[in-house]
Regions:
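SAM-dependent nucleic-acid methyltransferase catalytic core
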Residues: 2-41, 49, 93-202, 206-213, ...
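Alpha-helical elements of the RecA-like P-loop NTPase motor core of helicases
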Residues: 44, 68, 87, 192, ...
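SAM cofactor-binding core of SAM-dependent methyltransferases
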Residues: 48-119
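A cross-domain feature marking catalytic cores of carbohydrate-active enzymes
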Residues: 60, 205, 241
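Short amphipathic alpha-helical segments
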Residues: 70-72, 90, 195-196, 214-215, ...
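Charged helix-capping and loop-helix junction motifs
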Residues: 218-224
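Conserved beta-strand signature within the Rossmann-like core of class I S-adenosyl-L-methionine
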Residues: 235-240
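Binuclear metal-ion centers of metallo-dependent hydrolases, dominated by the metallo-beta-lactamase
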Residues: 242-249
Length: 249
């Protein structure tokens, strides 16, 4: 088992050394899923560090920013414990045109945002997906926890245009996901189920000290359990964290 601990500074330094790698020339799709701690800007850096593999697994899928920008693997697995996120992805797969039409018809409005954010999400999977994505794209802080967030607004960038552009990008995003297995599992079960000598795991867990921004109720003990599990796997793993005394330990 090979376990790489990567922080932002190390990733950037290593990326400069590996820019000649062929995989860096792959032009992927930018995920429209806004996500706290997402790796949109570090995706190419992380991709450049990946070893050759047959099965690619993201136990903490989140916004899928690395998955969608990398060259497809023979087997790909996206997993997340967030039921609303997974419901949106599955709805996008099964009802793409209807979902996009519903989202395109919505206006960027503080009134709509405040009304929907104060209400429970609908029980119907389709309506739930529509509202969830609208709130995610208009939320100031794109967290998936119970923490409240204000409405995105500003004078430099049009939030309305940004939202509509994201809906357009969902079409290519859905096409990229067609070859991906989408799971709703605890990260431990996901790792154990897909572990093999040909598997590469991208491990992007909740950050230490920022656990409240994510679902799952992570604690210091959870981080330790993840480290213990990764020491036992047959495959390879790349772990992303910010520097912290607990992680250094």
């Amino acid at each position: 088992m090979t376990n790489l601990l990567l922080n932002k500074k190390e990733a950037l330094n290593t990326f400069e050394e590996l820019t000649e790698s062929p995989i860096n020339r792959v032009k992927g799709i930018h995920s429209p899923i806004r996500w706290f701690g997402g790796k949109y800007y570090l995706a190419k850096d992380l991709i450049s560090l990946m070893p050759k593999h047959h099965c690619y697994v993201e136990p903490f899928g989140g916004g899928g920013h690395v998955l969608t920008q990398k060259e497809p693997s023979k087997v790909e697995v996206y997993n997340d414990i967030d039921r609303n996120l997974v419901n949106f992805l599955l709805t996008l797969r099964s009802s793409r045109e209807e979902l996009l039409a519903s989202l395109e018809s919505l206006h960027t409005s503080r009134e709509i945002y405040n009304m929907w954010s104060s209400q429970p999400l609908p029980e119907d999977p389709f309506e739930r997906a529509v509202r969830w994505y609208y709130l995610l794209r208009h939320r100031l802080i794109p967290n998936n926890s119970e923490l409240k967030s204000g409405f995105r607004s500003g004078t430099e960038k049009s939030v309305a245009e940004d939202f509509q552009n994201s809906v357009v990008r969902l079409q290519q995003f859905e096409k990229r996901l067609r070859r991906v297995n989408i799971e709703l599992l605890d990260y431990k079960e996901c790792i154990r189920r897909y572990d093999s000598e040909k598997t590469f795991f991208l491990i992007d867990p909740p950050y230490v000290g920022r656990e409240a921004m994510y679902q799952g109720g992570w604690t210091e003990q959870t981080h330790r359990e993840l480290a213990s599990l990764l020491r036992t796997i047959k495959g390879k793993a790349l772990v992303t964290y910010y520097p912290d005394p607990l992680i250094d330990e």
